[in-house]
């Protein structure tokens, strides 16, 4: 019978669609990358998704985040994404976690119930903790490396973390994961050399914070605020979603 996933099923097949419908994917970080991951997963037929983020939509998110509009400024990203998901497919089971993932709260998440984990968080500490937890629970994970300060969306690659180059975040992750005995990690990274952002305090979040009320205003604590574009993190997110969908659909993990 014709349905909203009929065109997808023409490529993947009925058995693959059943796998996707029965899968539960956790997306950590619902920002420039993570938002597009969620969008593509839901449009591809994933049946259950966990959304993990404690941030609110900010005016500065409008340039790149799929959940950011004038109407959603000030709303929690998890709430906006949940509403968007149900507008696309009301049958998706959505579990929201209004918090940032940290080593301290890692045990609060039902990792045993996840079929796949997407790491789209910003900090190295959280990324490492998430990778370690996924490894401990034997859950497949894919991690997003740096998408800020990049101009060339065609430079993204899928690779093992130990085969990456150029990306400063990937370099730190390689070092830290090697220390912890992690043998492999699928990542999406850019081979493009980062562009140094223009130093202009008049448009810097560090000195002109406009975070919504109730937000943690962490931008004022950051050493550097990366530049970003609509067509770069979105592509990274779609590539990640493609890997997750194919891994689940074709039982590659």
Language model: regions and residue ranges:
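Conserved SAM/SAH-binding loop
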Residues: 98-106
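Glycine-rich phosphate-binding loop and adjoining beta1-alpha1-beta2 segment
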Residues: 46, 51-89
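Conserved N-terminal Rossmann-fold NAD(P)-binding element of oxidoreductases
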Residues: 27-29, 52
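Short, well-ordered coil/turn residues at beta-beta hairpins
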Residues: 120-121, 144
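Hydrophobic/small residue at the entry helix of a nucleotide-binding pocket
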Residues: 33-34
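Glycine-rich phosphate/adenylate-binding loop
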Residues: 2, 112-113, 126, 136, ...
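N-terminal charged helix/coil linker that caps or initiates catalytic domains
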Residues: 1-26
